[in-house]
UniProtKB/Swiss-Prot annotation:
The lineage of its organism: Bacteria, Bacillati, Mycoplasmatota, Mycoplasmoidales, Metamycoplasmataceae. It comes from Metamycoplasma arthritidis (strain 158L3-1) (Mycoplasma arthritidis). Belongs to the universal ribosomal protein uS4 family. CDD domains: S4. Keywords: Ribonucleoprotein, Ribosomal protein, RNA-binding, rRNA-binding. This is Small ribosomal subunit protein uS4. The keyword Ribosomal protein applies. It comes from the Bacteria.
Amino acid sequence: MSRFLGSIFKKSRRYGISLLENNKEFTKGKKRTTAPGQHGARRVKPSDYQLHLYEKQKVRYMYGLNERQFKHLYSIASKKQGVTGVILLQMIESRLDNLVFRAGFARTRAQARQFVNHGHFTVDGHKANIPSMVIKVGSVIEMKPSLQTSPQVKDAVEAMTVSPWLTKTDFKVTFNRLPERKEFAKDINEALIVEYYNRR
């Protein structure tokens, strides 16, 4: 786990944002503006391609998606009516692991993913153990009793807030609506992601 966190801390510094969305990566001191590594202080203007790639990677790392998963969601989003970048973010936000995180059942998306993998949740009364599962609006996600007394869950419930597009009652949460663009992280520029894939 420590190696994973170390990697996330370095990536957060590289991209200049908290990928964990809690600023934990920067609590030990002043937030650095340089990239990690011996030559991190060298300011080199990134190329146009690098800007687009960095934006894609930033969102990937923030939500914990691998390249295949991210590309698959983009492919679906690009075929839908509407603004492709916003639809992509809405689909990512609709993943089961992310909704467990947004509901405040876990401190991080990695922890939420672990809970889902271990079969601790149901969706509309049915077993759900696939973190990447895209949940439909109106669905109800419920935590099984086996996890409800966990100290990790208690810690998360006390520390985290529930996103406004969800309604939570005890260990049950309803996915009421898709989040609006203004509710996503302000540091995300989804237009660069769309341009990245359009150029490939």
